[in-house]
């Protein structure tokens, strides 16, 4: 099977399995479809000759493609099983359309269009095949394009390149706090360094991520009948709104870019007695990150003084750290990636990613893990699309990295 056909076939096969993560679940994995996808991948890994294939109770799959260059450093690739829940359908219906410069109708029945004026980046792919969904869901190239790249890579290593041991890991629930990567026993993934394939357009390389934390703030009010509420009722919903008002409206995701940090007040559930607010804290700079956490604490204390008959409790939990510190301690992964892209004639676009990846978790565990492109655009959107030529180039980079690692 030609490389292009295999990549597209694998992507369609993996996309057909509903694996949207569920942030309300405390289970790992948070959805049964992730376990089903993990089982399929484990079977396919065994079929193409991987050794030590293991799938555990949390749907974490690991294995190794043994090398033919014993002196080469062991390297790894990691991808996540889940697709994101942004309120769209969990069922993905991918299709391949040829882009000829006109708006693409991705769902005629629902009259959903991928419009060039709104997504001018598609103009770079004039005359090419584009994988899109049907507009009712995300496409799920984040991260099933990476799974397809890694599985195609593993099946072709012996035929195309000399290589050392190549370890692979597929983990659940990246989209809800990197739960799978955090739970993974890295003794099952004993590589010197690794790669995530979890960013967007052709040439993108991520050497920095946010520092990230989540915060749960609980406001306890005082309930009362409205006919006798004066001087007594403390409305927890209004307490939460008051809390939010203490933060700069411009320090939010929709008002920031580049290296700006932000607060994201994300979920609010309230009744007459209690309101629960979720806030996400993001900053590239460690000092700025800590200042933001201290700001949450300071505002909570102000609220306690303002509402003496109510109460405010909060808990801040670190989610992941900026990957840059770990990458600086061992530069081989980045050097090989840059060399691979240079030899393939792919211009690199180094970005500070306004998000995080499983690689941030692995890096904190001692395995430096930079991130490179799948080739897709518009992650977490119904307008997510994947140009097939960019998809192929992602595989070429992975193959070249394995080859170069064996000759270092």
Swiss-Prot record:
Protein's UniProt name: Peptidase T-like protein RB0614
Swiss-Prot/TrEMBL GO biological process terms: peptide metabolic process; proteolysis
Cofactor: Zn(2+)
InterPro entries per record: ArgE/DapE_CS (IPR001261), Bact_exopeptidase_dim_dom (IPR036264), Peptidase_M20 (IPR002933), Peptidase_M20_dimer (IPR011650), Peptidase_M20B (IPR010161)
Keyword terms, alphabetized: Hydrolase, Metal-binding, Metalloprotease, Plasmid, Protease, Zinc
UniProt-listed CDD domains: M20_peptT
Entry binding sites for Zn(2+) 1: 80, 142, 198
Record NCBIfam families: peptidase-T (TIGR01882), PRK05469.1 (NF003976), PRK13381.1 (NF009920)
Taxon lineage: Bacteria, Pseudomonadati, Pseudomonadota, Alphaproteobacteria, Hyphomicrobiales
């Amino acid at each position: 099977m030609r490389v292009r056909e295999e990549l597209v076939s694998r992507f369609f096969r993996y996309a057909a399995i509903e694996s949207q993560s569920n942030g309300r679940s405390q289970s790992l994995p948070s959805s049964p479809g992730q376990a089903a996808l993990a089982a399929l991948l484990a079977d396919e890994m065994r079929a193409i000759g991987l050794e030590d294939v293991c799938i555990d109770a949390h749907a974490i799959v690991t294995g190794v493609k043994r090398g033919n260059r014993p002196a080469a450093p062991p390297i790894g690739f990691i991808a996540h099983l889940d697709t994101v829940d942004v309120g769209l359908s969990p069922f993905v219906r991918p299709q391949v359309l040829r882009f000829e410069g006109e708006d693409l109708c991705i769902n005629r029945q629902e009259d959903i269009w991928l419009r060039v004026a709104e997504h001018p980046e598609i103009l770079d792919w004039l005359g090419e095949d584009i994988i899109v969904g049907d507009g009712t869901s995300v496409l799920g190239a984040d991260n099933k394009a990476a799974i397809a790249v890694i599985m195609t890579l593993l099946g072709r290593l012996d035929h195309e390149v000399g290589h050392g041991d190549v370890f692979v890991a597929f983990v659940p629930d990246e989209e809800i706090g990197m739960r799978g990567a955090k739970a993974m026993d890295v003794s099952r993934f004993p590589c010197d360094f690794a790669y995530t394939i979890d960013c967007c357009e052709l040439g993108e390389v991520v050497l920095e991520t946010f520092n990230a934390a989540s915060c749960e703030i609980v406001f306890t009010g005082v309930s009362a009948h409205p006919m006798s509420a004066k001087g007594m009722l403390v409305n927890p919903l209004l307490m939460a709104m008051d809390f939010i008002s203490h933060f700069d409206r411009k320090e939010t995701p929709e008002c920031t870019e580049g290296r700006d940090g932000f607060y994201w007040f994300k979920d609010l559930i309230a009744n007459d007695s209690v309101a629960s607010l979720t806030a996400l804290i993001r900053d590239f700079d460690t000092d700025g990150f800590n200042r933001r956490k201290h700001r949450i604490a300071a505002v909570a204390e102000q609220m306690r003084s303002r509402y003496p008959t109510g109460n405010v409790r909060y808990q801040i939990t670190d989610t992941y750290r900026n990957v840059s510190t770990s990458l600086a301690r061992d530069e081989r992964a980045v050097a090989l990636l840059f060399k691979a892209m240079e030899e393939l004639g792919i211009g690199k676009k180094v970005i500070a990613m306004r998000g995080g990846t499983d690689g941030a978790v692995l890096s904190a565990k001692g395995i430096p893990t930079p991130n490179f492109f799948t080739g897709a655009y518009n992650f977490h959107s119904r307008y997510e699309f994947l140009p097939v030529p960019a998809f192929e180039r992602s595989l070429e980079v992975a193959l070249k990295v394995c080859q170069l690692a064996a000759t270092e």
